[in-house]
Amino acid sequence: MTSTFSSLDVSAFTSAADRILAEAVTGDARVPGVVAMVTDRDRTVYSGAAGQRSLGGSAPMTTDDVFAIFSTTKAITATAALQLVEEGLLDLDAPASTYAPAIGTLQVIEGFDDAGEPILRAPKSVPTTRQLLTHTGGFGYDFFDEIYNRLAEEKGQPSVTTASRAALMTPLLFDPGERWQYGTNIDWVGQVVEGLRGKRLGEVFAERIFAPLGIENMSFILREDFRSHLTEIHARNADGSLTPMGLELPSPPEVDFGGHGLYGTVGEYMKFIRMWLNDGVGEGGRVLKAETVEMALRNHLGDLPVTMLPGVIPSLSNDAEFFPGQSKSWSLPFMINNETAPTGRPAGAQGWAGLANLFYWIDRQNGYGGYWATQILPFGDPTSFTKYMEFETAFYDALKS
């Protein structure tokens, strides 16, 4: 790949980043605690923690603390699928039902009749794995979609946070390929991977991704050794105050949900980011071929736009969008910003987020990536997201200097 090797003023960035983290955990609108890191191709160049693991608790936040990483799980599932493509086992453009038969039974919901019953029809096609990876498969989330929310409230459709097989079995919202809509697509990619490997997704990750990356502290199971370092998920109340939620994802889960189910540390995620910065190579071996990385990170969405995420369930998400007014696309694992972002992130960089206000970016042009981790609901928390944007901006300011 063509790269520009920029020089980071590490001292200036460390000073600015430490200040931003300290500000984030101070004042009435504070976050309880935050961990943030930046890596270059070789090592973590900034690692910071501020605040507390749980509001009112005595444990300070540390860089070794464990987070529910929510949708930052998705890119790891995409990586497992890309390995199958390399091996000639997965055809991205074949119906996903070839590998995960249950997806072929799902119908399209067109709304509700006068009696409140779902109006269903057969889809024009079964989603392909490529469509699932690019969020054009037809799925949504109940916290971002009114129809799914109504199915949950009136018909008892289980939430994905139950980690149950029943939670996967939602109708499609539209015919595959029609538009981009963020949803449970990557959970189905996980089912494709399991169908081809004959193993649970967590086992596939451990053997084929975590081992060559040297990742030990990441799992779909909330291990006992994680509990002593587990960061509490908090709710941001309407008045801006915070309440510990006591929320945990089911462990062990009935299904390893490839869209959101991992627990892990930010330091371990740095190893995953470094793999993308190094054309597929981890510290213990190759995860993806360089040509696979290049193929995967192109725009696979065509002219379809990535749109704002509407906060349908206010306790889970605000209206949220990266870089409003700017064009965004989707690669196979990530969102692509098509224009230079206000933070300084260059056009063509990759990134995404997790529901509890976790955010990351991967800038292969300059050879850096970063991750900002908090545990707050709803998504799009004004303090966490704003401070993340300041953190990323401070990085690019120090890179230019």
Swiss-Prot record:
Keyword annotations: Hydrolase
PANTHER family: BETA-LACTAMASE FAMILY PROTEIN (AFU_ORTHOLOGUE AFUA_5G07500) (PTHR43283:SF3), BETA-LACTAMASE-RELATED (PTHR43283)
Similarity comment text for this entry: Belongs to the class-A beta-lactamase family.
InterPro entries documented for this protein: Beta-lactam-related (IPR001466), Beta-lactam/transpept-like (IPR012338), Diverse_Enzym_Activities (IPR050789)
GO MF terms, alphabetically ordered: hydrolase activity
Active site positions: 71 (nucleophile), 74 (proton acceptor), 182 (proton acceptor)
Claim: Repeat is one of the keywords in the record: no
Catalytic activity: methyl acetate + H2O = methanol + acetate + H(+)
Source organism of the structure: Gordonia sp. (strain TY-5)
Claim: GTP-binding is one of the keywords in the record: no
Lineage: superkingdom: Bacteria
Function: Plays an important role in the metabolism of acetone derived from propane oxidation. Catalyzes the hydrolysis of methyl acetate to acetate and methanol.
Gene: acmB
EC numbers for this chain: 3.1.1.114
Protein name as catalogued: Methyl acetate hydrolase
First-tier enzyme category under EC: hydrolase
